[in-house]
Amino acid sequence: MRILGLDVGSRTVGVSVSDPMGWTAQGVEIIRINEDEKEFGIDRLGEIIKEKNATGVVLGLPKNMNNSEGPRAEASRNYAKLIEKTFGLPTDFQDERLTTVEAERMLIEEANISRKKRKKVIDKIAAEFILQNYLDSKGKLTK
């Protein structure tokens, strides 16, 4: 049973996947999207769901530091509804506050990756953090 983790932005969706036991998360790829033109990368996401035999999807929920939700949180909730409707998979959310900051810090301090290269992988690593935090706190996602 594998779970996908998503970091949904307005231009990209970072994708990660759990191992079959649901213990660890690893980055998969970054899907290009365009919210303005209603292009949400659903075809590619469907391919990944099939390739990885995913049984559920966890999306990062970008909350403000005061725990309120803004427009990006609403966009994540809408993306989850689209996934449920299109693929019939259960979805859940994981607070993603500071995951991108944490991913950026790791890439700078531990991997010494240049800014240009960081931009190419940051969303995938943020998706990894989102999914790993979910697995550590909640475990398996089922219908």
UniProtKB/Swiss-Prot annotation:
Top-rank lineage group of the source organism: Bacteria
Keywords noted in UniProt: Cytoplasm, Hydrolase, Nuclease, Ribosome biogenesis
Enzyme class per UniProt: hydrolase
InterPro entries: RNaseH-like_sf, YqgF, YqgF/RNaseH-like_dom, YqgF/RNaseH-like_dom_sf
GO molecular function, one term: nuclease activity
Subcellular localization(s) per the UniProt record: Cytoplasm
Function per UniProt: Could be a nuclease involved in processing of the 5'-end of pre-16S rRNA.
Recorded family membership: Belongs to the YqgF nuclease family.
Protein name stated in the entry: Putative pre-16S rRNA nuclease
Source organism of the structure: Leuconostoc mesenteroides subsp. mesenteroides (strain ATCC 8293 / DSM 20343 / BCRC 11652 / CCM 1803 / JCM 6124 / NCDO 523 / NBRC 100496 / NCIMB 8023 / NCTC 12954 / NRRL B-1118 / 37Y)
